[in-house]
């Protein structure tokens, strides 16, 4: 699945999201997906080629690079974006199911007074209520979990969010502890901190949306007649 397909799917979900959910989707596309596609390759395009170690031992440089960068930053961020966006597919499938049921009832004549034609059913905004409320809320909950897990994995895997200029490596087949130098560490640190910060903003937006949904759910229950 390419980014265009993902955008079209999430764009469909966006029609039925809350205002906070629409802000989250905007942040996701502009500050994460577009930045990753446009700028990340320029920053990390030289990561292995310009990873220099002060040894001529065959294989030492590759082993040291694999030790300090087991997964490329770009691939990890791409995987994070895919995992974070996946829960929205649950909402998209649920909305599609609801529309299918309405079309079926319309064709049988059960709800002909509610809609003029099938096209109106297709364009109608689906309200977040009933079982769809639970699906939508669950998708946001998993988004928060995935964001937090990936931030933790990133921190553990790379020993923090700041790129070091020099790293030491004594893995086999290196003859001794060798010094290895990372290309453009400051630029990569700035980019990493930016991506992590945006990820944190997305978590805050998701938590805010969860609170909003629960408050609206509770206020709706309190208004029901006893």
Swiss-Prot record:
For the keyword Cell membrane, the answer is: yes
Regarding tissue, the record states: Detected in cochlea (at protein level). Detected in cochlea. Liver, kidney, intestine, lung, spleen, stomach, testis and brain, but not heart and adult skeletal muscle.
Pfam families noted in UniProt: Connexin
What are the disulfide bonds?
53-180, 60-174, 64-169
Q: How does it sit in the membrane?
A: Multi-pass membrane protein
Intramembrane sections: 2-13
Checking SMART domains in the record gives: CNX, Connexin_CCC
Q: Which GO terms describe its cellular component?
A: connexin complex; gap junction; plasma membrane
Residue ranges annotated as Cytoplasmic topological domain: 14-20, 95-135, 211-226
Q: Name one GO biological process term.
A: gap junction assembly
Localization in the cell: Cell membrane; Cell junction, Gap junction
Record note on quaternary structure: A hemichannel or connexon is composed of a hexamer of connexins. A functional gap junction is formed by the apposition of two hemichannels. Forms heteromeric channels with GJB4. Interacts with CNST.
Protein family per UniProt: Belongs to the connexin family. Beta-type (group I) subfamily.
The task this protein performs is described as: Structural component of gap junctions. Gap junctions are dodecameric channels that connect the cytoplasm of adjoining cells. They are formed by the docking of two hexameric hemichannels, one from each cell membrane. Small molecules and ions diffuse from one cell to a neighboring cell via the central pore.
Name of the molecule in the record: Gap junction beta-2 protein
What is the organism field in this record?
Mus musculus (Mouse)
